[in-house]
Regions:
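Sec/Tat signal peptide C-region and signal peptidase I cleavage site
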Residues: 19-24
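Mature-chain termini and adjacent capping regions
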Residues: 25-26, 52-59, 144, 168, ...
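Gram-negative outer-membrane assembly/targeting C-terminal domains
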Residues: 247-271
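Gly/Pro-enriched, hydrophobic low-complexity segments
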Residues: 34, 84, 95, 106-110, ...
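Bacterial N-terminal signal peptides
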Residues: 8-18
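Short amphipathic beta-strand and strand-loop transition segments with alternating hydrophobic
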Residues: 67-71, 150-156, 208-209
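Bacterial N-terminal signal peptides that target proteins for export
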Residues: 1-9
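N-terminal mature ectodomain segment of secretory-pathway/periplasmic proteins
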Residues: 27-113
Length: 271
């Protein structure tokens, strides 16, 4: 009997070592998180043309035409998102600034109805982006890579082999846990599940990954509020890489008239 227990223990040890080696053979957590972050934010020095749809009771309630510029200027990294249409929403803008010397961000928002540029703290970036199911942070620098992410293992999700990562954000105003499923081949997120402070599933995010010009990228993001059943969708219509972006569009003071900047015509007319 003792020999049988020893044999069983040896087998379990071999299986555990094999599993550990298989996980260890892949990229480390930092690499996975970095690539996931880039996938969600879009490529640097590029412009994304997108549609944002708000879904209520199963039907689209509103659709916004967005442009998003991602680039560097004045010693910082910036992501600017601007609503170009419809007319009643045109000019809504969100500017996210990431200092190159730190991981902290500074957020600016502009609502045409008030004609004011508002600067707010990073913690407020988790608030809803103008009544959609996305937060401001979802449209800016995604706050990942704080060191708390852990690789749980690999599994299959929606027919794709994925890495499963678990994160317990410290002092997060809304989330106690975030589970991410990242495709092993592209390191792009397939799904992310957000749990509230009480540990209940709050939101789910699903991403569609397609290969465009030989490069895997996210072409659709669906954020669903589990409690309300409502959702919001971002469809990436086009990505214009390696684009020279004028530095003045990243100036907070210019947000008041940013929708009329001539730069947007150079990218939207190329569709």
């Amino acid at each position: 009997m003792k020999r049988a227990y020893l044999l069983l223990a040896a087998i379990l040890l071999i299986v555990a070592c094999a599993t550990t080696s298989a996980v260890a053979a892949g990229p480390d957590v930092k690499t996975i998180v970095t690539q996931m972050k880039r996938g969600l934010q879009g490529p640097d020095n590029a412009v994304r043309i997108m549609d944002l749809k708000v879904i209520s009771n199963g039907s689209p309630a509103v659709t916004w035409k967005l442009v998003q510029a991602n680039g560097n200027a004045n010693g910082a990294h910036w992501i600017l998102t601007v609503v170009l249409a419809p007319p009643d929403a045109r000019g809504i803008a969100f500017l996210d600034k990431e200092e190159t010397s730190s991981t902290s961000t500074v957020n600016y928002a502009y609502l045409p109805a008030t004609r004011r540029v508002i600067e707010f703290a990073p913690v407020e970036g988790y608030d809803a982006f103008f009544a959609t199911d996305f937060s401001y942070q979802d449209l800016g620098f995604v706050l990942l890579g704080g060191g708390g992410e852990k690789l749980v293992g690999t599994e299959t999700r929606d027919g794709k082999k994925v890495y499963k990562l678990e994160d317990h954000p410290i002092n997060h105003p809304y989330y106690s846990k975030v589970i991410s499923y990242v495709a092993t081949d592209s390191l792009m997120p397939v799904e992310r599940d957000f749990y509230d402070r009480a540990g209940k599933l709050f939101k789910t995010e699903h991403c569609t990954i397609e290969t465009v010009d030989g490069v895997p990228m996210i072409t659709k993001i669906v954020m669903k509020n589990v409690e309300s059943g409502n959702s919001s969708e971002i469809d990436v219509i086009k990505v214009i890489p390696n684009k020279q972006i004028p530095a003045d569009i990243f100036e907070p003071k210019n947000l008041l008239h940013i929708a009329d900047h001539p730069f947007w015509k150079t990218v939207t007319q190329s569709q």
